[in-house]
A protein has these predicted regions:
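Adenosyl-5′-phosphate
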Residues: 2-211
């Protein structure tokens, strides 16, 4: 309900916020905070397309341009190539993507049933209990990791000295986030994990430190 009073493109863009933008902003150093753009990058992407496009198609546009490209395809490619496996994505054939983009809304979502035309096309080919079973995510036990086996690493990598030397984040805000998460007051596990990954990335590719 945090974004319930947002209008138009602001509301559509808010559905794709992995983390609360205000929380992200609070974690940044004063120098980086001052350089933040005044407009949400997702809203900027929506400004590139026509206003009369239906909200569902706007959401699919953001899904394809940002979430799919930067998240799903990215980690699928990295993980598969790390194992020496070539993963193909036939549903991203350019002709099929263009055809799907032109389809009327009623073929994409029928009442609360998403991927409607795709599911109808598979009837008679796959069992209906496979086609229409509820979607299941592939989440990881992030909170258990952060509060368990990664707890010591988090304290070492995101120490006050480390944060101050990097000058990207506010060490007081980061320390408070970690403390509140460990105390069970909030679930800050994904924020902490992203901070951890950023610092490790910086050590490897900027500092050229062999970890």
């Amino acid at each position: 309900f945090r974004y319930a009073d947002f209008d138009g493109d602001s509301r559509i863009a808010s559905y794709f916020n992995w983390l609360d933008p205000n929380v992200v902003k609070s974690l940044l150093s004063n120098e980086l905070r001052a350089e933040l753009p005044s407009i949400n990058p997702l809203e900027h992407s929506l400004s590139e397309i026509a206003d009369e496009i239906p909200p569902l198609n706007k959401m699919l546009y953001l899904e394809q341009k940002h979430y799919l490209a930067d998240h799903n395809l990215n980690y699928t490619d990295k993980m598969s190539m790390a194992m020496g496996i070539e993963v193909r994505v036939p549903l991203l054939d350019p002709d099929l993507v263009e055809l799907s983009a032109r389809l009327p809304i009623k073929f994409k979502q029928n009442n609360r049933e998403g991927k409607w035309i795709f599911k109808k096309a598979m009837e008679g080919i796959l069992p209906n209990d496979v086609i229409y079973r509820p979607k299941t995510g592939f989440g990881v036990p992030m909170r258990n990791w952060i509060q368990g086996p990664l707890k010591k690493l988090v304290r070492e990598i995101l120490s006050e000295t480390s944060i101050n030397n990097r000058k990207w984040f506010d060490h007081k805000a980061v320390s408070q986030l970690i403390a509140q998460d460990q105390a069970g007051k909030i679930d800050g596990s994904y924020s902490i994990f992203q901070l951890l990954c950023i610092e490790l990335w910086a050590r490897i590719f900027i500092d050229e430190d062999i970890i």
